[in-house]
Each structure stands twice: as C-alpha cells, then as structure tokens.
C-alpha cells in the first residue's frame, strides 16, 4: 500500500504518528516518528538522509550564464506524499473523535439543564 515507505525499510507504515523534514548542507533529513508503545518513555523514530539533486539552471540566456541549484530528491517527494496520506488520515480521525466527544458533552449539559428545569416545575406543583 505504501511502496516507497516499504522500500526504505518501514515495515509498519500504519504505526507512523508524524514526521519532520529539514535540510542539512546538501542533504534532506527525514525523521519518522512512530506511535509510542505502552510503557515506553520515548516514541521510536528513524532517520533517513537523502542527497539533494543538483541542477544547472540558465540564469541569463544572453551571456549563457548558469547557476547550480539543488532540489529535493524525487524519491523523497514520493515518500513525503505517502507520509502525508498517513498523518492526515490520523489527524482526521482525531478531529472526528474530538467533534463527537464535544457533541456528547454538549448533549450532557442540555439534558442536565432540562432535567433540572423539569424537577423545578415538579417542585412548584407540590
């Protein structure tokens, strides 16, 4: 399902919680964090180093001046796409759970208030 993550040795992509990406010299450093298991103090993480691709870009066509630039490795782009799918899906699930819990708490308050109102009306009848 996640061929690029599998190709770099990640056997359980569903356990990924988040990731970070930074540039260091001529490399991009990808750090993948996994969900913390019960009893662990720190979450497990793995680090990958991807060399940036170098390109010569024409700056001035009149003088035929070129400038060397670097850009993200194509493989890393595919890996990030897969990581985004995994992490966004988890965030969506968490957001839905928060919404449901919020709705439930609101319903509890409404019902509690209504019960108090009915009890007050009953007291008036005595």
UniProtKB/Swiss-Prot annotation:
**Species classification:** Bacteria, Pseudomonadati, Pseudomonadota, Gammaproteobacteria, Vibrionales
Family named by the database record: Belongs to the UPF0325 family.
Q: Which NCBIfam families match?
A: PRK13677.1
Return the Pfam families for the record.
DUF3461 (PF11944)
Organism (species): Photobacterium profundum (strain SS9)
Q: Which HAMAP family match?
A: UPF0325
Q: Which domain of life is it from?
A: Bacteria
**Which positions make up the signal peptide?**
none
The entry's protein name is UPF0325 protein PBPRA2971
């Amino acid at each position: 399902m996640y061929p690029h993550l599998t190709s770099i040795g990640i056997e359980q992509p569903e356990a990924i919680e988040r990731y970070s990406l930074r540039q260091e010299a001529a490399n991009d450093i990808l750090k993948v964090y996994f969900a913390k298991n019960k009893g662990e103090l720190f979450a497990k993480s793995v680090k990958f180093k991807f060399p940036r691709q170098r390109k010569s870009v024409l700056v001035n066509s009149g003088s035929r001046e070129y400038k060397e630039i670097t850009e993200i490795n194509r493989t890393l782009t595919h890996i990030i796409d897969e990581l985004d799918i995994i992490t966004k899906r988890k965030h969506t699930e968490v957001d839905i759970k928060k919404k449901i819990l919020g709705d439930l708490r609101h319903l509890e308050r409404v019902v509690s208030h209504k019960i108090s109102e009915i009890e007050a009306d009953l007291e008036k009848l005595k």
